[in-house]
Amino acid sequence: MKTPTGPGTAAPRRGSRRIVDVAILTGALLALVAATLAARWAWTPAPGPEEQVSCAPYGLEDVSTAPRGGARPLSTGPVLSGGLRWAEGTSDRLDVTFEHDGTTSSYHVFADGIDWSEPVGVVFRLHGDGAYEYEHPEHKVSCLAEVARSHNAVLVAPRTPDRQGEPTWWEDLDGNAEWFLALAEQRIFAEYDLDRSRTWLHGYSGGAEFISYELLADRADFLQGGGAVLSGGGGAPSTGTSQPTDEQLEQLVLHWDVGLEDDGTDPYAPFDALSAAAAGHAWYEDAGWARTSVRYREGVDHFELPEARVLDAAMTAGESPGERSAELSPAASTEPPRGAAADGRD
């Protein structure tokens, strides 16, 4: 396995002195990214109830969908194994509170349009720093939910329980992972009749870092099938305690997606996601994960990734193991950034 040697490449561990350095070096950078995201998207008015959201900004040129979550409705209840709790069918559930071991946060579940007579998968969407998309699910998250629905999967979008400054997933890896896994086991898998062999993690920026540094590195047994999509980040952990099975190593889809312009030189996006993605992909490939892939996108920065299209391609690849996805393959004209596998950061 490769151990990145560049500054900040190792994952911060709770209780480690390195977390202080990591917080100083990266906190301001990712906070600026989060502020930029909010500034860039805040001008976009929320769509009305009769309007359709175009998914073209997220890679699906011909797809529009109803906005999800603008009115913050609660559903009639989740689906339990063996039947429904209160009503004939389910709908979206927003801002549902969940507490575990003294830690409280909330989550959305997007379940409109699911066929519960067939196997149902799940996509866990992990937001970037600042949690903007959690607070405004009527845009990108609506398109991601539509992709999940097209594969008969619900989309779950939790908000990090972090309340110290800018909300992040990666600053308290262990604590946030404990809350997230408890949410998944005690609420999502317990209340909904889901096929665990179709479980997906989908993270953007700081959410991608959380997946690569913690969920895959130390808690891979959570994924019994499906895989992970890491957009705009996903660096290499310093160590990993997970002991994946041969089946996991052979079948789980792990895909990194990043723009070639997402190298930290943009003052509005100082996080070097390009190096992080290259380092993370190399680490997991060297660790024996057979279905890893990375796509470096020309002319694309931290804010322009076709996340909905990539999620669709990854889920399709998971359903068709024998087929190679052109969307997930490196473009013929692009190559990994020179030296990036050793220069990622937290």
Describe these PLM feature segments:
Residues M1-R17:
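Terminal targeting segments of Actinobacterial cell-envelope proteins
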Residues I114-P167:
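Short substrate-entry loop that stabilizes the transition state in hydrolases
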